A protein has these predicted regions:
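Short C-terminal tail/terminal secondary-structure segment
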Residues: 146-147, 221, 232-243
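The beta1-alpha1 cofactor-binding region of Rossmann-like NAD(H)/NADP(H)-dependent oxidoreductases
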Residues: 42-43, 63-74, 106, 214-215
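Substrate-binding pocket helix/loop in short-chain dehydrogenase/reductase
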Residues: 100-101, 105-113, 201
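Conserved glycine-rich cofactor-binding loop
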Residues: 9, 16-17
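Alpha-helical segment proximal to the catalytic Tyr-Lys
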Residues: 129-130, 171-172, 229
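Short, small/polar-rich loop/turn modules that mediate ligand/substrate recognition or access, typified
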Residues: 174, 179, 231-233
């Protein structure tokens, strides 16, 4: 088996579950040493680390609340102490609230934008300062910014901001050979998928199913390798034809 990321190092925020977990496992399967960033669920993060270790890989988990700049700095410090200077950063941490905009509170706004926008901002800021030349930055967005789901105004607004971070940062880091891209999944089997939407979501795809986290991870794995060297500043749809 080929290991296109052998000798590379990666940090994945929100890496303990769902799409982040799948990306962590995928990059590790390609030979990368992986650090998992998580907020609350230590048990899940440790499970990912164990799964990677059992397969012969190197991994570690670090708790951090990325809405606080000092926590982002600490996460990167711990990652570098564990695996060395970073080649790949995946900003995947996210939260969602589903309710009409008129019913959203300031607390809802702060919670969603703290995680999805501010947390990504601080992650990208540290990545821009620390990533090796020729590195990779991958940001999780959502196909919802193209599909316009009602009740997700805060979530979609927070992700729309992130997509613009990607476009601007790709130009800021291009002279160092660093690629910066977003992935926008369609409906995917994660904790965010509500049972009442599952059948309708599956019908949006020509494949008549919702995505598996591994489907999204495959796109990240491509972007992280040398094969993705000429792709930057893009928001790549991974929705199984749903948009």
């Amino acid at each position: 088996m080929e290991y296109p990321l052998r000798g590379k190092t990666a940090l994945i925020t929100g890496g303990s579950r769902g799409i982040g977990r799948a990306i962590a496992l995928g990059l590790a399967s390609y030979g990368a040493a992986v650090v998992i960033g998580y907020v609350k669920n230590e048990a899940r993060a440790r499970e990912v680390v164990k799964t990677i270790a059992d397969a012969g890989g190197k991994s570690a988990a670090v708790q951090a609340d990325l809405s606080r700049p000092t926590e982002a700095i600490r996460l990167f410090d711990e990652a570098e102490r564990t695996v060395g200077a970073l080649d790949i950063v995946v900003a995947n941490a996210a939260d969602i609230v589903v309710k009409p905009l008129a019913d959203c509170t300031e607390e809802d706004y702060d919670r969603i934008f703290d995680t999805n926008t501010k947390g990504v901002f601080f992650t990208l800021k540290e990545a821009a300062r620390r990533l090796k030349d020729g590195g990779r930055i991958i940001v999780s967005s959502t196909g919802g910014t193209r599909m316009f789901f009602p009740g997700q105004s805060l979530y979609l607004g927070s992700k729309g901001a992130v997509e613009q971070f990607v476009r601007a940062l790709s130009w800021e880091l291009g002279n160092r050979g660093i690629t910066v891209n977003a992935i926008s999944p369609g409906p995917t089997e994660t904790d965010m998928m509500q049972d009442r939407y599952r059948d309708k979501a599956a019908a949006m795809s020509p494949f008549n199913r919702i995505g598996d986290p591994a489907d999204i991870a495959a796109v990240a794995m491509f972007l992280a390798t040398d094969a993705g060297r000429w792709v930057t500043g893009q928001n790549i749809g991974a929705g199984g034809g749903a948009f």
